[in-house]
Curated annotation (Swiss-Prot):
<dbReference type="InterPro" id="IPR008932">
    <property type="entry name" value="Ribosomal_bL12_oligo"/>
</dbReference>
<dbReference type="InterPro" id="IPR014719">
    <property type="entry name" value="Ribosomal_bL12_C/ClpS-like"/>
</dbReference>
<dbReference type="GO" id="GO:0003735">
    <property type="term" value="F:structural constituent of ribosome"/>
</dbReference>
<comment type="subunit">
    <text>Homodimer. Part of the ribosomal stalk of the 50S ribosomal subunit. Forms a multimeric L10(L12)X complex, where L10 forms an elongated spine to which 2 to 4 L12 dimers bind in a sequential fashion. Binds GTP-bound translation factors.</text>
</comment>
<dbReference type="InterPro" id="IPR013823">
    <property type="entry name" value="Ribosomal_bL12_C"/>
</dbReference>
<dbReference type="GO" id="GO:0022625">
    <property type="term" value="C:cytosolic large ribosomal subunit"/>
</dbReference>
<comment type="function">
    <text>Forms part of the ribosomal stalk which helps the ribosome interact with GTP-bound translation factors. Is thus essential for accurate translation.</text>
</comment>
<keyword id="KW-0689">Ribosomal protein</keyword>
<comment type="similarity">
    <text>Belongs to the bacterial ribosomal protein bL12 family.</text>
</comment>
<dbReference type="InterPro" id="IPR036235">
    <property type="entry name" value="Ribosomal_bL12_oligo_N_sf"/>
</dbReference>
<keyword id="KW-0687">Ribonucleoprotein</keyword>
<dbReference type="GO" id="GO:0006412">
    <property type="term" value="P:translation"/>
</dbReference>
<dbReference type="InterPro" id="IPR000206">
    <property type="entry name" value="Ribosomal_bL12"/>
</dbReference>
<dbReference type="Pfam" id="PF00542">
    <property type="entry name" value="Ribosomal_L12"/>
</dbReference>
<protein>
    <recommendedName>
        <fullName>Large ribosomal subunit protein bL12</fullName>
    </recommendedName>
</protein>
<dbReference type="GO" id="GO:0003729">
    <property type="term" value="F:mRNA binding"/>
</dbReference>
<dbReference type="Pfam" id="PF16320">
    <property type="entry name" value="Ribosomal_L12_N"/>
</dbReference>
Length: 122
């Protein structure tokens, strides 16, 4: 007796839930498998992608050729005095701001790069 897929589906559909559970148990035993759903393994770096970063650090990596403009930009962004801003620029690489939003970090990076500095967001 050979059943088509359609006939097999109709036969299963006509069974009660308890009969289907018994059928599944018998199939598991016959074929040596389990009907349990396997959990999908996360893709490489999945945990990092799922946990999106919300706080960023802006790091001045190099002052560039126009140090005066960079010092002015650092003063405007951080509120430091002239001497503190100059010391910070000359001690590059240095953290300018820590724990700021992505938008604020991007704005600061843009302003410093326009002044001639090399900046990283971490």
């Amino acid at each position: 007796m050979s059943l088509t897929n359609e006939q097999l589906i109709e036969a299963i559909a006509s069974k009660s839930v308890s009969e289907i559970v018994e059928l599944i148990a018998a199939m598991e035993e016959k074929f040596g498998v389990s009907a349990a759903v396997a959990a999908a393994a996360p893709a490489a770096g999945g945990a990092a992608a799922a946990e999106e970063k919300t706080e960023f650090n802006v790091v001045l990596t190099e002052a560039g050729a126009n140090k005066v403009a960079v010092i002015k930009a650092v003063r405007g962004a951080t509120g430091l005095g002239l001497k503190e801003a100059k010391d910070l620029v000359e001690s590059a690489p240095a953290n300018l701001k820590e724990g700021i939003s992505k938008g604020e970090a991007e704005e600061l990076k843009k302003a410093l790069e326009e002044a001639g500095a090399k900046v990283e967001i971490k």
